[in-house]
């Protein structure tokens, strides 16, 4: 099968670029002092410490967003080039953390979240090569918790470093330790923190399977390590569970009827488990018959119901979970008529409706709204390419993979686009966000962070109290203008 038939997924994604992007080696990092006129992040608002944000659903609680956009879009605060990677960063404590690759080094870079000024970096060697010709950089977003940053590289190296200065605290080579056969696009499921545990999608295999090539992936079996939990402070193994292989959806954690649950959309279907022990409640088979297929959209949990979706075959299903099992509320029928077929971009639930990009390819993707409890299609809008969403203040910030940024009203009545813009460099008129722009936008303390193939752009989505438009800053990842 040609690689063009398999759009790269990360989720995690999510978040992507093309091989050869970025800089082989940036200049030696030099901190930059900023004048007082440069925008600073508002004291109000929330951090965005992990993939899909603090509530794990790509929804922001911040309000007062700019809805009347000028022709050039919301004000650009700062921007910088990126290395090779697919993921968007994370924001905590006034710092922005970005995970990229430069040459043969995977690198975490810490920047001032409001100015883009370089603070420090941490790196480690990597020789990962993608089977399908997509880029060789990280797919996962950094996870920040309790003064630590967790990194999960494309080759399966798991690192924990200090969020203050990048010093190494512990590391585990999950591919070597658990016998992971390289997946279609490498490792792309961002870990999650649960109490004292770091829960990681691993999906290892017994020794007799480890020489299988990518064309024999259906012959690869699990060794019971679909879900692996480590002590988040020490890196010690706490448990391994699940007879499944890894895919690209991020584990989802939720409280259902007073009990903590974990949901992992693995290669062959959805696993419901107890996150503190790894005890498995159920496995719901849900995978396309296509050999080169993945499950990449993170499960969406509302009350005691869990929504899953994929784009290669069966489509979507809604389950009602209970200890030891589940009931199917609805699922897409066989054939072509599917409610939602999200690829890597996780849909967002809002007031009884689900909004997301449905479609396997750029050309056939639609932005859709469906009814949560029935799957009924409320509206669809073509031509937006595969898009990623962020909910804030009654609207969706919608980033198409072609780099087009839109503001869409969150309503089931019809598609209502309030603004549409292609962000451009003021001096060259070149697009700031080049295709593919596969990472979902993030919002933290009024600042909107977006990435395209090789550039990170920070916008002021929520105006400062004084309403003053701040000057642009164009930086490199080492902090130089």
Please identify what each model-predicted range represents.
Residues 8-19:
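Bacterial N-terminal signal peptides
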Residues 1-4:
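Positively charged n-region of N-terminal signal peptides that target proteins for export
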Residues 21-481:
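Noncatalytic, solvent-exposed loop/strand surfaces
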